[in-house]
Amino acid sequence: MKQYLDLMQKVLTEGTPKNDRTGTGTISIFGHQMRFNLQEGFPLVTTKRCHLRSIIHELLWFLQGDTNIAYLHENNVTIWDEWADENGDLGPVYGKQWRSWPAPDGRHIDQITTVMNQLKNDPDSRRIIVSAWNVGELDKMALAPCHAFFQFYVADGKLSCQLYQRSCDVFLGLPFNIASYALLVHMVAQQCDLQVGDFVWTGGDTHLYSNHLEQTNLQLSREPRPLPKLVIKRKPASIFDYRFEDFEIEGYDPHPGIKAPVAI
């Protein structure tokens, strides 16, 4: 994951101090891209331990169209707790937009089912896109989508994906985002009988919070280790039928975890 460490160093070196919604303060750059060849290993950061259970359960939760944290709590995942209301609701966040985008005529559009059909029936389409950025519902969301828009691309029997992330917490959030979308590419590729290609990450406001700088320097002092391998144990009937037990990571040997506060 040299690309990730290079980005951290770039933000430290070239970033501009900025205020932010949380009041914490950041140093920020605008516009950065990383490319991960998924044939070369699963892009899970090795310079600190990442909580893979949370990454997998969150993605499965998104794919179910769920926007209440009850499922996450049942599986000991707390990453959305700070934004949920007293009933555990988050408003029409990612899962709602992915699976039930409201159309003006009263229909609800299942974007995930749509892209699965496109990949199987029209893989050369340039419109194989999922958006979570629903302008009409942003004010109802507990948190506006950070990873807002992604596009699939098929060439030579390989599935690639590019994500646009409008706001990126480089230290805490980005390792989750990279692994989550890499996992999604593997799942979609398997369902469509494709090989995995590249995951391309594109960031807008790409920042380190001012209270993450010590942790960032510690992480930069560590040598990256070989990437692990993702094993998917079965092929379910649909993209929506995966379970946590279907996934195994082999050869993950990270450095110890590094704690840092979440900016809310």
Swiss-Prot record:
Q: In which pathway does it act?
A: Pyrimidine metabolism; dTTP biosynthesis
CDD domains assigned to the protein according to its UniProt record, in alphabetical order = TS_Pyrimidine_HMase
Listed EC numbers? 2.1.1.45
Query: Subcellular localization, per the record?
Result: Cytoplasm
Q: Please list which residues make up the signal peptide.
A: none
- Which residue ranges traverse the bilayer? none
How does the annotation summarize its subunit structure?
Homodimer.
This protein is called what? Thymidylate synthase
